């Protein structure tokens, strides 16, 4: 693992402390590395109406996007699970749209890690090219 990935995981672990997860007690922290070196973080926020909550990855990327960031090179996700957790399907779709070429590094609080890519997580994803008309 590179020093940059280790630093990004540390940022995700720190972001995890801000998680609001009273229903599942499954705290998640995420960090995105922009091409200019800026690190954007987020934590999951749950709601009693489960579908209204947001995952840490989407909190981080939406925060970054609304502050002008557009080019991301890496995503880190940290959970307290027994094995590294990858982003959910909705987060994979959002990451494909805004960070398709990013590396994804996931880790547990115990230090177990996994490295992959956004495209590997969603190999046949729906993107702008899917909207092209054949008529």
Label each residue range with its predicted role.
Residues 38-39:
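Hydrophobic "anchor" residues
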Residues 2-21, 67-135:
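C-terminal binding/interaction regions
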Residues 44-58:
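Compact, glycine-rich, soluble single-domain proteins
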Residues 34, 45, 86-88:
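Glycine/serine-rich anion-binding loops at beta->alpha junctions
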Residues 12-15, 56, 60, 64:
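Stable alpha-helical structural segments in soluble proteins, enriched in small hydrophobic residues
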Residues 27-34:
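Short beta-strand scaffold segments in enzyme catalytic cores
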């Amino acid at each position: 693992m590179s020093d940059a990935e280790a630093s990004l995981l540390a940022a995700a672990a720190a972001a995890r402390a801000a998680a609001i997860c009273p229903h599942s007690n499954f705290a998640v922290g995420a960090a995105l590395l922009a091409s200019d070196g800026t690190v954007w973080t987020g934590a999951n926020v749950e709601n009693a109406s489960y579908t209204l909550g947001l995952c840490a990855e989407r909190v981080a990327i939406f925060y970054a996007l609304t502050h002008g960031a557009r080019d991301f090179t890496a995503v880190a996700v940290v959970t307290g699970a027994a094995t590294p957790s990858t982003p959910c399907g909705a987060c994979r779709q959002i990451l494909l749209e805004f960070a398709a070429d990013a590396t994804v590094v996931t880790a547990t609080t115990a230090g177990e890690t996994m490295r992959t890519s956004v495209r590997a997580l969603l190999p046949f994803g729906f993107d702008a090219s899917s909207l092209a008309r054949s008529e």
